[in-house]
Regions:
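Intrinsic, low-complexity N-terminal interaction/targeting segments
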Residues: 6-10
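Short glycine-/aliphatic-rich beta-strand segments at the starts of folded cytosolic domains
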Residues: 11-32
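Short acidic (Asp/Glu) and glycine-rich catalytic loops that position anionic groups and cofactors
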Residues: 18-22, 54-57, 86-94, 167-179
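Small-residue-enriched alpha-helical segments and adjacent helix-cap loops
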Residues: 27-158
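Generic alpha-helical secondary-structure signal
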Residues: 74-77, 193-196, 212
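Mobile "lid/hinge" segments at catalytic clefts and subdomain interfaces of large enzymes
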Residues: 147-206
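Radical SAM enzyme core and accessory elements
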Residues: 201-203, 209-228
Length: 228
């Protein structure tokens, strides 16, 4: 057991129930870990007393039973971890690997990240996305505040790669809810849709998407329709 030092706590490092111990979350954006960083963290972890690395179902890895100094070191090694909830968005592997996947869910997530980075959009108010390549639950789209699952959309009588937008899901205890279909958007328009949503959120006083949606659901539905 280490000495308690709560100055170490931040969005990735948190205190455990055991006095003086901390855990570190490593959530690489899109679930794609930097192999060198991950191996370096694991190589360091095996030299420590009773420290474990546990894989989470949302593409994150947790290093547990760390002292404050050890937690700082692990966080430093894995500094490519997602910096906010939006960057912690999850997707299944998608159609490039999955034999029954309809669309490339992981590719969509990467396209979204790349587009918003290129545009210099502040993503701190956007929620975590949950993206599945098909109606199955591998990307847990049903529980996302914003979820997507792979689909097809006819545009000028031609089938286009698209994703069904699922609205209002929740995994939080006491407010558990499966989201409902709110639109069908061609995949190439989704990054621009999220750019527009982020710009609206950043101009609003509400602290995050969930709070904004409570009083602006009509505006949100209109935005979805504008991109359908």
């Amino acid at each position: 057991t280490g000495k308690r030092d709560d100055s170490v706590e931040n969005y990735r490092i948190h205190r455990q129930k055991q006095e003086g111990l901390y855990y570190v979350e490593y959530h690489p954006a899109g679930g794609d870990a930097n192999v060198e960083h991950l191996l370096a963290a694991l190589d360091y972890a095996v030299t420590l007393d009773q420290v474990e690395a546990r894989i989470a179902p949302d593409q994150a890895l947790f290093f547990i039973n760390l002292t404050a100094d050890e937690a700082r070191k692990i966080a430093e090694i894995t500094d490519d971890s997602a910096e906010n909830d939006f960057r912690r968005s999850v997707s299944c592997v998608g159609s490039t690997i999955c034999q029954i996947g309809m669309q490339d869910s992981n590719g969509l997530l990467k396209d979204i990240f790349a587009h918003l980075e290129k545009k210099g959009v502040d993503t701190r108010k956007l929620p975590r996305l949950h993206i599945s390549g098909c109606p199955h639950s591998c990307g847990t789209h049903q529980i996302g505040e914003i979820g997507f699952h792979g689909a097809v959309k006819l545009v000028d009588k031609k089938p286009m790669v698209a994703f069904i937008l699922v609205d209002g899901g929740s995994e939080h205890m006491g407010s558990e809810n499966f989201g409902k279909m709110a639109g069908n958007i061609v995949a190439t328009k989704i990054p621009e849709f999220l750019e527009s949503l982020a710009n609206i959120l950043n101009e609003s006083p509400e602290p995050d998407f969930g709070t904004w949606r409570l009083t602006h659901k009509g505006d949100y539905m209109n935005l979805i329709k504008a991109f359908e």
